[in-house]
Amino acid sequence: MPSKIFVKGARENNLKNIDVEIPRDALTVITGLSGSGKSSLAFDTIYAEGQRRYVESLSSYARMFLGQKEKPDVDYIEGLSPAISIDQKTTSQNPRSTVGTVTEVYDYLRLLWARVGTPHCPNCGKEIRQQSIDQIIDQLMALGEGTRVQIMAPVIRGKKGEHVKIFEDARRSGYVRVRADGNMYDLSEEISLEKNKKHNIEVVIDRLILRPDVVHRLTDSCETAAALSGGLILANILPDDRDILFSQNYACEDCGVSIEELTPRMFSFNNPFGACPTCTGLGTQLKVDPDLVIPNKSVSLLDGAICASGWNNVRGDGISRMYFDALSKKYHFSLRDPVEKLPKEVMDVILYGTKGEKLELQYDQPRGKGVLYQAFEGVIPNLERRYKETQSDGVREELEACMSECPCPTCGGKRLRRESLAVTVGDLSISDYCEKSVVDALDFVDQLTLTDQQMRIGERILKEIKNRLGFLRSVGLEYLTLSRASASLSGGEAQRIRLATQIGSSLMGVLYILDEPSIGLHQRDNDKLLATLKRLRDLGNTLIVVEHDEDTMRAADYLIDIGPGAGAHGGQVVAAGTPQEVMANPNSLTGQYLSGKKKIEVPKTRRAGNGSFLTVRGAQENNLKDLDVSVPLGTFTCVTGVSGSGKSSLVNEIIYKKLGADLNRMKVHPGRCKAIEGEEFLDKVICIDQSPIGRTPRSNPATYTNLFNDIRDLFASTPDAKARGYGPGRFSFNVRGGRCEACSGDGQLKIEMHFLPDIYVPCEVCKGKRYNRETLEVRYKGKSIADVLEMTVEEALEFFRDLPKLEAKLRTLSEVGLGYIRLGQSSTTLSGGEAQRVKLATELSKRSTGRTIYILDEPTTGLHTDDVKKLLEVLQRLVDAGNTVLVIEHNLDVIKCADYLLDLGPEGGSGGGTLVTCGTPEAVAACGASYTGQYLKKMLR
């Protein structure tokens, strides 16, 4: 086996025909400026080729489902192993996915609870024991004389297949009827079941009417049913077709409640045998929220206080107005009064209806006048009914804007049915155990006391649970609970969970490619992560990590610096070798920062702010412990703390959502707090995150920044365009008229290949230019609209230098370090850091009011130290204009440049949620109790 991976002639995206050697069974870090080509090399070339070769070895039928990747633009790659990509874009959005299910810990927990769990009665809580035939007979006879009963044997419960043999065996044994999936069949007829669906099948043993003289016959029938089904007896009570399940295995002596033998599927919320029947295992239900139906209580009904689909036209003369006129007349209130001044009884009637009491509705229409007598359904029941009845995704989406998730009333958010929640191990249900953090869950397992028999059964299961929980702790995720929804995890957390899962799999000879695993991780936990990466390497694997973190780069066996610039100015190997060799290379920008020759300077002064504060009182969201904090306005404030300390809960859930609801009229549910003071000093809140600036290839930097509108206006003002009667719309590739209709303005056509990846080919008509011939004939300074879209920001800045409006927007894009991107570059090809800087440039180009608060969550994700320097310059400019910048960050270069710090902690999860210290970076560095301060002290020397 070769000792290196050889990449020859890589040309994917902006890579300039580069050759790279990567040592096998080593930790290699690829670094460079944002947009320099790191991901193009690691993911789009090496991973894509490794994955493609693996998928190519499968059958054509399997390839159709796996979505084969096309061959990357590279001459050849030697020494490749099967590749596993662990990036930040694969966080599951499935509401059924949790930390426990993703790490497979929950699979072992289900097995543990099924094998050594103690069942209890869900009604009285008493421990359940096996039920004898005599007890079953007594319960059936208690139904009363004359009751008609069918005794059935449940032979198949929730299993796929046609089950032909089951029917044949029942027929040979002399049985006449079976019930399959709730339908009764005669065994003399042909019974056909779908092979790929789960089925329930019961054999009818006997049909009888309960009387004292049938006890012996009933006993025989029950014994036969139990023997046939393995201890289960199903009594079908006629004529109301009600089923009662009895088990020889477990039943409550007092309540008579039976449960089947404990199996792992009983504890799965993704299986109908374990999931709560009300919420089907989601743990939550969407309910219409009165606060979202009427978000602004200071507005009157007549002025549109009700912001719900179908209820916006109270001012008109439709059916809504008729109802509200009748309500105001009957309950004596004015439609012009603000909602907050209406009595509670009136609001209850408006929201929940008249409960069947009829109103006098007067109508006056062209067809005549009259009176109708109808009950008022109520706004909330009306919205809930329409949500259940609609078949339209659009209508459902509209209605969901007025709904919020709340815990399921049946299971209380625990996802499982009552019988499953009544099974305990060490006095805890499986749901209660999953509410514990990883570190508490480990302590519980270590202290668990079992009988000798239970220990023999559960020993191996407990070992697997401990191992997986230990791996989660080793990657700095000890604060997460096993019940935490995967969709709520940050990109860094999700990536480290997948990393922990891979360690648990103990694979050897694999190529792992990771994308910034240190994101969201406090400096304190970085050593744990590095130890984990080295452990994965020492198992006999090759690791390629795209990373900007200095500690990770220093710990690497091999370092590759891609650059020298970004975009068209990048795509070359600037330096490669050990970290020491890269530091000694004068051409490497990364090496200069690593060696200390270049660094981000600490500001000479700190702003004190404008004298006003935004104060949060009694913050209690998630793990926040009745927290009071103040953000000085007119400053660059950074919220710090170890992972899981409550930073996102404070900033994103409380501050952003509360200000968004009050200042921006957003329909959101702010996190729990007693009050927020100081909103009157702000006029809007803007969250600048790393989400894409558009979801389709049609979106690009020019359209997002509104630069394209100005460019289209410019082309429409040319003499040629005026002579032809072309307006700005002619130069849009999104509407008919000027665009190429052969490709609908996409510039390319998608060819479906079925067993191969889809191919995108340039449109033969417009040659990829998006516009028709007539539109392209209109030119400004000799360039067509398509030529302008192909320009980089730098080229466009020179081209439009005599047009102040265009020049100003282009200059801000250049100042945030995006001079290399093309104006028409598809937004889907931009990295998270690039998308964030496009948003920042858009904000910078707007006229500042000086009363805006900008919120950023880890803005340094994907940014090189040199990019961080540019980002800080932009953020400082926003603050210099009188605005407030509030940032969640772990990057010490950003933290040391802030005016004010709020350090949360001291630990993550239940050990966090308090304010450790606050003040200038120097004040925080002087606090011995602050983990952030300990690392910050070294940076301020």
Where are these regions (language model features)?
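Conserved phosphate-binding elements of NTP-dependent enzyme cores
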Residues: 1-941
